């Protein structure tokens, strides 16, 4: 009986370890966001930049009432891991004519920031970041 339970125990341990790593990355992303993004962005209210809650999966340039550059409004993309990584690496190279003059040079910080932004777009019950904000 013990031998039969071993694969299940290992699977549960691996899942718990992966979840803990995800939570650490989200927490790191929240710190990066607080340190580097809050000068222009908030989670829920448009400021110098548009609000960030729900950005993951949102069409670029689509927040009603926010004055986006023409380039971003016409970009025809949805924010996901790939587009956010390219955007945060070099916004002007990714979408020439956009208005954001900010980069996240560290690949690790970009990945953490993207994980945090993605967690903000998840249903509240499944989002560790939602409980912290």
Where are these regions (language model features)?
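Soluble non-cytosolic domains of exported or imported proteins
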Residues: 27, 31, 46, 78, ...
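N-terminal secretory signal peptides that target proteins for export/translocation
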Residues: 1-3
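C-terminal capping alpha-helices of c-type cytochrome domains
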Residues: 80-128
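Sequence/structural segment immediately N-terminal to covalent heme-attachment motifs in c-type
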Residues: 23-45, 52
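Short cysteine/histidine-rich metal-coordination sites, predominantly Zn2+-binding motifs
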Residues: 53-59
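Bacterial N-terminal signal peptides
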Residues: 5-15
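Electrostatic cytochrome c docking/interface patches
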Residues: 14-33, 130-133
């Amino acid at each position: 009986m013990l031998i039969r339970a071993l694969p299940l125990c290992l699977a549960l341990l691996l899942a718990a370890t992966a979840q803990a790593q995800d939570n650490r990355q989200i927490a790191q992303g929240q710190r990066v966001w607080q340190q580097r993004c809050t000068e222009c962005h908030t989670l829920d209210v448009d400021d110098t930049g548009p609000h960030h809650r729900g950005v993951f999966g949102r069409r670029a340039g689509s927040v009603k009432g926010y004055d986006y550059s023409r380039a971003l409004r016409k970009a025809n993309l949805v924010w996901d891991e790939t587009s956010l990584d390219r955007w945060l690496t070099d916004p002007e190279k990714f979408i020439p004519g956009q208005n954001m003059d900010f980069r996240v040079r560290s690949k690790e910080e970009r990945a953490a920031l993207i994980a945090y932004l993605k967690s903000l777009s998840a249903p509240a019950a499944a989002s560790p970041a939602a409980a912290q904000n």
